[in-house]
Amino acid sequence: MNGRADFREPNAQVSRPIPDIGGGYIPTEEEWRLFAECHEECFWFRSVPLAATSMLITQGLISKGILSSHPKYGSIPKLIFACIVGYFAGKLSYVKTCQEKFKKLENSPLGEALRSGELRRSLPPGHYTQKPKYDSNVSGQSSFGTSPAADNIEKETLPRYEPIPFSASMNESTPTGITDHIAQGPDPNLEDSPKRKSVTYEELRNKNRESYGVTLSHKTDPSVRPMQERGPQKEVKVNKYGDTWDE
């Protein structure tokens, strides 16, 4: 026993197996007879009346000038088209009636398939898949009533973990390469160091003027001039032998 009791409601509906009707299904004799009856009734009571009615309506529209006739064949093409449309419309309109006849047929796999399909469509979704209430209640009670031996086995199989100290967990969780130092503020010595004085444009211009004046004074100073720029030299006489003498 697995500890669960499976109860079913007395009025619970069980899904009926749908007969397998595939392409190779061979109808029974009663089904063949009903097929012939449906075909005959559909032809005489639906297809022929609708085809004739559509042809008459088409001819009336052509005679009134609402529909134009063919220049060579007249109204024949439109009448043929109206007849075909009425014929197939009659066959489609008789499908529902023929299905109802097959549903009333006893010992018919085709009728059973039609009845089962209609029953499934009429029921809400999930009707057959819904579990009884007794099953869920009993399963809930059996889950609480487990044996003590099962509890002991579960406790033995569970892994045991030793408590970890808080300090050890903090040390293990700390990433390597990162020190727990407090961010320090700016160095006061750096703040006390004299700041570089900003130079304005006027000061730079005055400084350039002073340097230019010093350079200009050096150029105009006679002591700095080259020897060639000084006064004219004294004339010296030279004889034909290249000797010089002063007068």
UniProtKB/Swiss-Prot annotation:
Domain of life: Eukaryota
Subcellular localization: Endosome
Keyword Phosphoprotein: yes
InterPro entries reported for this sequence: OCAD1/2, OCIA_dom
Listed Basic and acidic residues bias regions: 192-210, 218-240
Note on domains (UniProt): The OCIA domain is necessary and sufficient for endosomal localization.
Name of protein: OCIA domain-containing protein 1
Annotated source species: Rattus norvegicus
